[in-house]
Amino acid sequence: MIQVLLARLKQRHRTMKYPAAPPPEMPDRFRGRPLLAGSKCPEGCRACADACPTGAITLDPELRLDLGKCLFCTECEQACPQNAITCTRDYRLAVRKRQALILAPDQAELELAAALDTKSRRLFGHSLKLRQVSAGGCNACEADVNVLGTVGWDLGRFGIQMVASPRHADGLLITGPVTENMKLALRKTYDSVPAPKIVIAVGACALSGGPYRDHAEVQNGAESVVPVDLFIPGCPPHPLTILDGLLRLLGRLDESKT
């Protein structure tokens, strides 16, 4: 036991200071919010739309990109001969309205998630218990949600915890495209959470079905089964993107430090 204590003393404090301090630097391979330069698109070019594996890009009447469907695979960026699509380093992607994830040309920022109303923040602002439902996910989004519980992120310091039963929860955190076999289970889980409650959809699959969209055995995301209060896109979203969304929902972010 003494060796454990000595090792802990030597390691010192490992939890990052964010959001009280600036966020950690994102890795070189990180791909954040895309930026569209529609003016660069030559007439009749469909290179980006044809390259997109999920149909996230539309060109009529102008270039649009649906982040709810986007896998951040950069196939469109690589396919575009005019560099009309580039990925920024902006990790802030969470929104309250699904429609807010549809990017227009030269759109500088998303309409980022607004905080819950005052009554809800009083209930959940310092103690939010979530039941995580993997509705047919591949475990990538689940893994990055799990990362938030490690010592580096320490999700519990914000009063946010994952619980084992929906009856002990304030809401649901849903991953996966919602397979046919999980549709009823998700609905029953939602009904078991006491009101008032919130629902958070994490990852492209939970937002739109992701690469499985329109398959006969999936529901194209959580919103087709239960109402959703927060949408966090990505495949999978970075832990910082997930944390940013949760803190925005609870009104616990100082914008000057993000």
Question: Across the structure, where does each feature detected by a protein language model lie?
Answer:
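Structural signature of the thiamine diphosphate
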Residues: 250-258
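Ferredoxin-type iron-sulfur electron-transfer modules and their immediate structural context
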Residues: 1-51
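Cofactor-cradling patches in redox/metallo enzymes
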Residues: 143-145, 150-243
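Iron-sulfur cluster-binding cysteine motifs and their immediate structural context
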Residues: 36, 45-94
